[in-house]
């Protein structure tokens, strides 16, 4: 895979103080994986035929080579990043009574990693990771079930392969979290109304965060570097609701709402800013979804409205998005062999930012003297299209 970009973002001659820089990456990746699963049947259940079981093993080998061609490097940068993973997992689902079920599971993983590059940097860490889950499910009645669970999850550590990043920022550590969840699921009104609700709390440790830093070179030009690092601790609290209702064979209605409070308990970012107590990046306070689907014979019409609260773009600065709503619709005509659809996304042509950058000490516009300013990447504008599908 090869990709690159124009680092100066401008065309030649735009300003007397402009600079020209190209950054190109050539990556080669080889991946091999194997997973085997063994499941119980009626004759192999455990504990007096009350417990189903699952056992599995998983292996993964990944080898990634990088060649970076960059204007400000005296020679091309090379790196090789390899990791081997071997894991085993086991799960038991036990019927403690007609209404009560206990689910337990565990996964243990061994990960061996090597990294070396053309600047003579090399790392070879190994780590043993584990995660698991314990859940209790209680059947309230024939249509409703409540559950409670506690789980431990993890993300393996890794490396930032950018050749110009400081050596002490190349490696990042494992993240793990403990999650507590309570929930209920119900099927009502002759199984035409499906309801879900959940409440969760996450304690995150050594949280992996996407950071960025910028540098001014000797000639006055700038360099921007994205990398992954570790925050100390974070806490996530949230509530989720979902309702799906089919009042008739032709009409379907869906509504969902998620509320989230995700903050850093303690975190000093790459610019030595204390973000303790601040919201984590890309963690909107609410997300909502409304949808309708109506069918009459071969015709169908569907519409949806999605809403998202404001959020921070990064853990390296304080630039935020604005709240926004997106309206989508589709009208279709279908036969057994073909279908024709007229559809539109973002029908109100809402301007909304999905990513934001702010480099603090400088900007990247020579016409403004490289004054610091935010740069925003917007989502797609109003798009209207026609889709024709046929089965041969």
Feature map (PLM): residue ranges:
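Face-selective signature of the C-terminal outer-membrane beta-barrel domain
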Residues: 1-8, 22-123, 139, 196-199, ...
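Membrane-embedded beta-barrel scaffold of Gram-negative outer-membrane proteins
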Residues: 1-13, 139, 145-151, 173-239, ...
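Transmembrane beta-strands of outer-membrane beta-barrel proteins
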Residues: 51-55, 102-106, 132, 146, ...
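Gram-negative outer-membrane beta-barrel transporters
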Residues: 98, 102, 201-203, 227-315, ...
């Amino acid at each position: 895979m090869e990709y690159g970009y124009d680092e100066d973002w401008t065309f030649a001659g735009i300003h007397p103080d402009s600079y020209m820089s190209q950054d190109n990456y050539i990556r080669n990746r080889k991946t091999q994986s194997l997973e085997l699963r063994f499941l119980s049947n009626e004759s192999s259940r455990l504990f007096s035929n009350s417990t189903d079981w699952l056992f599995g093993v998983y292996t993964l080998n990944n080898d990634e080579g990088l060649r970076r061609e960059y204007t400000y490097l005296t020679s091309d940068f090379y790196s090789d990043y390899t990791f081997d993973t071997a894991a085993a997992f086991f799960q038991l689902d036990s019927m403690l009574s007609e209404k009560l079920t206990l689910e337990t599971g565990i996964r243990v993983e061994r990960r061996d990693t090597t990294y070396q590059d053309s600047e003579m940097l090399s790392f070879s860490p190994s780590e043993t990771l584990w995660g698991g889950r314990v859940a209790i499910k209680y059947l309230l009645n024939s249509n409703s079930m409540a559950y409670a669970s506690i789980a431990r999850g993890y993300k393996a550590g890794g490396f930032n392969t950018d050749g110009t990043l400081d050596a002490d920022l190349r490696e990042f550590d494992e993240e793990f979290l403990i999650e507590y969840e309570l929930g209920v699921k119900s099927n009502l009104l002759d199984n035409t109304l499906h309801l879900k609700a959940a409440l969760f709390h996450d304690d995150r440790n050594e949280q992996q965060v996407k950071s960025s830093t910028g540098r001014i070179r000797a000639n006055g030009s700038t360099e921007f570097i994205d990398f992954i690092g570790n925050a100390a601790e974070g806490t996530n609290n949230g509530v989720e609701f979902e309702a799906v209702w089919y009042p008739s064979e032709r009409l379907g209605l869906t509504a969902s709402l998620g509320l989230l409070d995700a903050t850093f308990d303690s975190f000093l970012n790459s610019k030595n800013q204390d973000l303790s107590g601040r919201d984590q990046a890309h963690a909107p306070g609410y997300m909502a979804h409304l949808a309708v689907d109506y069918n009459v014979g071969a015709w169908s019409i569907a519409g949806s409205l999605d809403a998202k609260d404001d959020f921070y773009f990064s853990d390296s600065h304080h630039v935020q998005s604005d709240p926004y709503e997106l309206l989508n619709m589709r009208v279709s005509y279908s036969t057994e062999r073909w279908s024709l659809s007229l559809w539109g996304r973002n029908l109100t042509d809402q301007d909304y930012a999905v990513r934001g950058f702010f480099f603090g000490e400088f900007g990247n516009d020579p016409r403004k003297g490289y004054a610091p300013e935010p740069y925003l990447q917007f989502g797609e504008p109003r798009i209207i299209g026609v889709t024709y599908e046929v089965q041969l």
